[in-house]
Amino acid sequence: MIEIKNLTKFYGRNAAVKNLSFTVNDNEILGFLGPNGAGKSTTMNIITGFLPSTSGTVTINGLDISENPSEAKKMIGYLPEIPPVYLDMKVKEYLKFVAGIKGVKRNERNQQVESAMEKLKIKDVEKRLIRNLSKGYRQRVGFAQALLGDPKYLILDEPTVGLDPNQVIEVRNLIKSLKKDHTIIMITK
């Protein structure tokens, strides 16, 4: 379960997020909708522990993200608005690299990478440099890295940005199927 209580974030005197509270139960999908500048991405960055809140609490599976950031982050797969991919790496090479950083056991890395590539339909570009991929493929590589380590929670900031209409449908169906094993919070347009 993810619990957000009275979450507030100020930048100077401007409130990006003010007294936000909600709960996402296990195996639920919560979608954030709102105009640009409404604080959606700021909220995601606080939930994932990449940005401190001004006040309030974020609890991930019983762990306060500010008190136990390392343990809480191990349970989260995060796809930021702009995927953090290394442009000079090949797709499979990058995903194996990320799996290692996430602490996936060496004997499980290849299987997890293959599974993520299959789910995101990127096997056909596994040997290509990321810099040579379209925005849609880069987005799917970013989504694949979020799945590595088999996180219980997925935080997805606009996971369908840059995808063509058919890919949007595929990714939405994938997200629905992931619900059986994951709790998902996502920003969508």
Where are the regions a protein language model picked out?
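Conserved ABC ATPase "signature" region
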Residues: K96, G100, N107-V125, K176
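A short, proline-enriched helix->beta-strand linker immediately N-terminal to the Walker B motif
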Residues: L148-K152, D181
